[in-house]
């Protein structure tokens, strides 16, 4: 695999990227295969069994709600990665690390367990590159490969945390407010459901509102569809980033008091827009634009919900 090649340092990041560009492989050649028609039932059974096992057995499980368990512990996949049996192996590898706190009263808080795990995860050797090419997620092998960009390391943390029954996932900016790239990082939820974040290899979990990067919009990857957005789309053709809304808009969690609705009057638009049209809020990236939010044109204005700094 690409991550394996880079991890073993047989090639540098530039050479790996060049090899992909010069060879015949292309992401566009990949075929979309639906899980429901191809997944091994034993994979689902094992995933469910191990997810419920850790939720019931770990002391912090009592403070993980059923909804958060279903969304941020139970899912058998993170995105479009190759499927595999991953929970048991990762559990057996990392669960002993938590023996030191398991009987302590504070172990009932999943945040405490997440802190202990991160302290161990970051000391293992890793190979980071911002040049990792676009494509499908690498899958659970990233836990062993420990190579890639911020997205791959965010995946690594999710696999480990979920295998131990700790609610965890990935928050992201489709485009950073101060850079020309997207960015991914991890979140967990404490016993009160409050969001704490970390950016590998930083071992510290901190409150989401402490994240200083200019953000504009922040989304949380989810397993379940955002039915509110599906209904808002009303069957219209959408940009691929929003066509299948497997996300929650969590900008307000990060922006605190710095966000409010952004209203744009039709009087200042440079193009005629009609009622019901889909309009995108974009950030620039070099010589292009990347949509980070969308809205439906109303009678005489556009209203984008909760961008930071508005």
Predicted segments with their positions:
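Short amphipathic beta-strand segments in non-cytosolic proteins
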Residues: 278-295
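Acidic low-complexity segments
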Residues: 38-112
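Short, small-residue-biased leader/transition segments that mark boundaries at the very start
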Residues: 2-6
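Short Pro-Gly-centered beta-turn/loop motif in secreted/extracellular proteins
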Residues: 301-310
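Beta-strand-rich domain onsets/edges
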Residues: 234-261
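A short, amphipathic beta-strand motif
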Residues: 260-271
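Hydrophobic/aromatic-rich core segments of domains that either
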Residues: 103-121, 130-140, 145-240
């Amino acid at each position: 695999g690409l991550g394996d090649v880079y991890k073993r340092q047989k090639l540098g990041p530039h050479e790996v990227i060049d090899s992909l560009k010069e060879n015949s492989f292309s992401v566009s050649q990949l075929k979309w295969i639906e899980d429901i028609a191809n997944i091994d039932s034993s994979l689902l059974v094992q995933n469910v069994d191990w997810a419920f096992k850790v939720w019931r057995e770990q002391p912090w499980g009592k403070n993980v709600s059923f909804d958060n368990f279903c969304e941020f512990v139970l899912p058998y996949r993170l995105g479009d990665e190759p499927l595999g049996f991953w929970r048991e192996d990762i559990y057996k590898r990392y669960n002993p690390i938590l023996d030191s706190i398991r009987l302590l009263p504070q172990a009932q808080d999943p945040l405490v367990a997440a802190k202990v795990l991160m302290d161990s995860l970051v000391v293992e050797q890793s190979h980071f590159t911002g040049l990792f090419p676009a494509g499908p997620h690498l899958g659970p092998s990233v836990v062993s490969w420990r190579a890639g960009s911020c997205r791959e390391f965010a995946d690594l943390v999710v696999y480990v945390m979920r295998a131990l029954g700790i609610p965890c996932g990935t928050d992201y900016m489709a485009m950073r407010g101060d850079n020309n790239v997207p960015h991914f990082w991890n979140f967990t939820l404490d016993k009160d459901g409050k969001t704490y974040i970390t950016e590998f290899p930083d071992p510290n979990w901190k409150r989401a509102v402490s994240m200083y990067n200019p953000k504009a919009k922040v989304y949380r990857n989810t397993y379940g569809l955002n039915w509110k957005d599906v209904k808002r789309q009303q069957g219209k053709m959408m940009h691929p980033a929003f066509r299948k809304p497997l996300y929650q808009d969590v900008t307000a969690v990060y922006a605190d008091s710095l966000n409010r609705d952004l209203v744009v009057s039709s009087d200042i638009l440079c193009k005629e827009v009609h009622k019901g049209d889909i309009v995108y809020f974009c950030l620039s990236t070099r010589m292009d634009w990347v949509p980070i939010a969308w809205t439906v044109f109303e009678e005489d204005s556009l209203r984008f919900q909760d961008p930071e700094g508005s």
